[in-house]
């Protein structure tokens, strides 16, 4: 059966999907301005989302139980206005060296841990709309949303997006059960990607180990690891003599 569509500002969407502005959907909450040197990976009372991790490390939906999130070195570094994040909050990276500016993460599975948003981020909390966990993280990293940001990016060497500009973007709100189905499908893909990445990383370690053992070390003439049938010493020649 062909699904009935309606034409909206961002294109044709299903008739039972809603559209609302970023401003209608979110309220911006307070972040901090801590740089990487104020963070550590050893431990602490409060963890901090750095914009660089949003751009290069974190997936669209940040599982706080699984991802390594740096800690604030000292609580005294946090201003009293900094607000703790909650499940369902989104954090936008407002600065980058390219058009990845505007990448978003959605916070999930915080549990009892404390988390804040750091330098060059725009943390936001939903004030209108019923969203399935994960929907905003996936939707706001789609081309449909990110392309809305592109006209508002400023800067030459460093790209940035302002709170005022991002407030003009539009948020799609499908029926809740459809959001859940879409998120479930994308979660399966993300899990597959994560699993395959771990396998590839293990293979890379094996390869690097082979590279270090299958070639002679300095001042040696035989490698530590050899293939069957090879026992002779290796020769070393200058490239110009070959």
Go through the PLM ranges and name each one:
Residues 1-14, 195-235:
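Short amphipathic coiled-coil heptad-repeat segments
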Residues 2-6, 15, 36, 43, ...:
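A short glycine-rich beta-alpha junction/loop motif
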Residues 3-33, 168, 226-242:
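Non-catalytic DNA-recognition/assembly elements of restriction-modification systems
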């Amino acid at each position: 059966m062909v699904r009935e569509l309606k034409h909206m500002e961002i294109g044709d969407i299903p008739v039972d999907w809603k559209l609302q502005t970023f401003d209608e959907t979110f309220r911006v909450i307070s972040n901090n301005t801590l740089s990487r040197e104020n963070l550590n990976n050893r431990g602490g009372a409060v963890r901090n989302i750095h914009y660089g991790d949003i751009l290069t490390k974190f997936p669209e939906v940040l599982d706080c139980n699984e991802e390594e999130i740096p800690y604030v070195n000292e609580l005294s570094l946090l201003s009293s206005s900094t607000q703790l994040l909650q499940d369902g909050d989104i954090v936008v990276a407002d600065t980058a060296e390219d058009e990845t500016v505007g990448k978003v993460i959605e916070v999930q599975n915080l549990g009892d841990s404390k988390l804040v948003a750091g330098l060059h981020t725009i943390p936001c909390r939903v004030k209108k709309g019923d969203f399935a966990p994960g929907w905003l993280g996936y939707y706001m990293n789609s081309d449909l949303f990110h392309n809305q940001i592109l006209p508002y990016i400023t800067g030459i060497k460093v790209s940035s997006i302002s709170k005022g500009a991002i407030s003009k973007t539009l948020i799609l709100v499908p029926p809740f059960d459809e959001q859940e189905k879409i998120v479930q499908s994308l979660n399966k893909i993300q899990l597959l990607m994560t699993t395959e990445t771990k396998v590839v990383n293990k293979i890379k370690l094996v390869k690097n180990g082979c590279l270090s053992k299958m070639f002679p070390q300095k001042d040696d003439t035989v490698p530590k690891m050899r293939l069957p049938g090879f026992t002779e010493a290796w020769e070393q020649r200058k490239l110009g003599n070959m």
